Amino acid sequence: MSLSLNAEVLASRYQLESLIASGGMGSVWRAVDLVLDRPVAVKLLRTELAQHPDTIARFRAEARHAAGLSHPAIAQVYDFGDASGDKPAFLVMELIDGPPLTDLIARGALPAAEVLDIIAQVAGGLAVAHAAGVVHRDIKPGNLLIDRSGLVKITDFGVAYAAGSAPLTRTGTLIGTPAYLAPERISGQPAGPASDLYSLGMVAYECLSGQVPFTGTAMEIALAHRLQSLPPLPSSVPPEVDRLISDLTARDPAYRPPSA
């Protein structure tokens, strides 16, 4: 897929301005909504991926799941468009003027107070999603954006699961990022709100320590979550924060907090 900055306006409405990021699934652009005269972010799906029904279904699901949720910590989705001719499928969302949490962690461990604030915001967004029957399934620093005022935004509901909907992946397919995956997911149990809370606890652990607890191949990391205890957090982490992380990352989902 290659779209130049002087490409035609998408859907007669969204003018692309500059590339924000690109990856295996496509790219995200800063754009302008010419109808409402406001800045937006536009996610473009790679045109070659539009030939795969599962990928298109997942892209639509991201739009549907996020558009039905309203919370300050959830990036708003405004519009969706199918591929048409040489134009790719696209998703229009709130433009977040800030980096992913991964960029902050790359500078080193974060203060406990800052981590608690981030976790509280994400938990609030997850509570709304879970109440609506939506489980994110891929909470990780790369899917959490921090704007200039310190507000956290949950993004990428592309692998989310909504209660009552048909699954978008084959049985036995592991969905999520191994470094943040709950132990019960490894044993084939379905994702639930407690799975998101485990992932959130792993995000908090990484923020406080500056690194993920387990490394290796995807399978080695996944098995470590199921079989090993987390390495101790730095001694500078307050005991009550340490206990919170322990609660969120309990191996048995029944021992995690009952809700976000």
Q: Which residues does each predicted region cover?
A:
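Eukaryotic protein kinase
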Residues: 1-260
